[in-house]
From Swiss-Prot:
Catalyzes the deformylation of 4-deoxy-4-formamido-L-arabinose-phosphoundecaprenol to 4-amino-4-deoxy-L-arabinose-phosphoundecaprenol. The modified arabinose is attached to lipid A and is required for resistance to polymyxin and cationic antimicrobial peptides. Keywords: Antibiotic resistance, Hydrolase, Lipid A biosynthesis, Lipid biosynthesis, Lipid metabolism, Lipopolysaccharide biosynthesis. Pathway: Glycolipid biosynthesis; 4-amino-4-deoxy-alpha-L-arabinose undecaprenyl phosphate biosynthesis; 4-amino-4-deoxy-alpha-L-arabinose undecaprenyl phosphate from UDP-4-deoxy-4-formamido-beta-L-arabinose and undecaprenyl phosphate: step 2/2; Bacterial outer membrane biogenesis; lipopolysaccharide biosynthesis. This is Probable 4-deoxy-4-formamido-L-arabinose-phosphoundecaprenol deformylase ArnD. Its EC number is 3.5.1.n3. It comes from Shigella dysenteriae serotype 1 (strain Sd197). NCBIfam families: PRK15394.1 (NF011923). Residues 2-260 form the NodB homology domain. One of its GO terms (cellular component) is membrane. The lineage of its organism: Bacteria, Pseudomonadati, Pseudomonadota, Gammaproteobacteria, Enterobacterales.
């Protein structure tokens, strides 16, 4: 039996309003629990359109057929008009998710984090995280114990900033296995649970065709030598490609693959490492990558 951490990122208003309820129903039918990370501020995701001037981002949008994948309401949110508030406007949905799944913070403002956090000072970052945690805790009525940086935009600055909140774990980077990042003080920090597997939009039209994706992904899972963690998005697998996701769950069960919340992947003893800026194929811009202590 192969155990895979299932992480669900919720980036937008429509992903929360439409995608999350569908995913909750799907997961319930398959008796699966996951870790769901919510963005809670007004939805400004459409402001990413300026990135179309970057060839790598433009190619990603074209090969993944972004207009049909996400919808124009997502692609234009927060551009010509004020974005819709996500968190409190969808409080009932978020509370329902928290009844059955592990719920954590993705971001206060997903667009702002992904576009600007790399240039923030530490206090600005702490204030932004605190605002998001406070809002999410108001909604679910209980402490938030985990987080996952939007767009995997994380480095040592993010690691240090999140220490102020004493979370159980963070999932801020890409890598191979859970670890504890070394702090500036030399002490180990809050556990990190990296995502190890590519997302749909990173590989469709580049490495694999849509109709072949499930088999391709399961092959990657079964060959994974670390601790497999897979990320889906409420805007993709909860909307346009929910049927593909259902087919994946059915095929995974047949092949002895089970899914679980990320916290179930933690152990008392974890290796030490760092989160450094790096790049991966299929994703524009830098993102946090796991580096095992002593490696270069």
């Amino acid at each position: 039996m192969t155990k895979v951490g299932l992480r669900i990122d919720v980036d937008t208003f429509r992903g929360t309003r439409e995608g999350v309820p569908r995913l909750l129903e799907i997961l319930s039918k398959h008796n699966i629990q996951a870790s769901i990370f919510f963005s809670v501020s007004p939805d400004n995701m459409g402001r990413h359109l300026w990135r179309l001037v970057k060839p790598q981002f433009l190619w990603k949008m074209l090969r993944s057929n972004a207009a049909s994948l996400y919808g124009w309401d997502i692609l234009l949110a927060g551009t010509a008009w004020l974005g819709k508030e996500i968190g409190h406007a969808n409080a009932d949905i978020i509370r329902e998710a928290a009844k059955h799944h592990e719920v954590g913070l993705h971001a206060w403002d997903h667009h702002a984090w992904q576009a600007r956090s790399g240039n923030w000072d530490r206090q600005t970052m702490i204030d932004d995280i605190a605002r998001g945690l406070r809002t999410l805790e108001e909604i679910i009525g209980q402490p938030v114990t985990c987080s996952a940086a939007a767009g995997w935009r994380a480095d040592q600055q993010v690691i240090e900033a999140k220490e102020a909140f004493h979370l159980r774990y963070n999932s801020d980077c890409r890598g191979a296995m859970p670890f504890r990042p070394l702090l500036e003080s030399g002490n180990p920090g809050t556990a990190q649970i990296p995502v190890t597997l590519p997302t749909w939009d990173e590989v469709i039209g580049r490495d694999v065709k849509a109709e072949d994706f499930n088999g391709w992904l399961l092959n990657r899972i079964l060959r994974d030598k670390g601790t497999p963690v897979y990320t889906i998005h409420a805007e993709v697998e909860g909307c346009a490609y929910q049927h593909n996701f259902v087919a994946l769950l059915k095929r995974a069960a047949q092949e002895g693959v089970t899914f679980c919340p990320l916290s179930e992947l933690l152990s008392e003893t974890l290796p030490l490492g760092q989160v450094v800026r790096g790049n991966i194929a299929g994703r524009e811009g830098w993102l946090g990558c796991q580096q095992i202590a002593g490696s270069r």
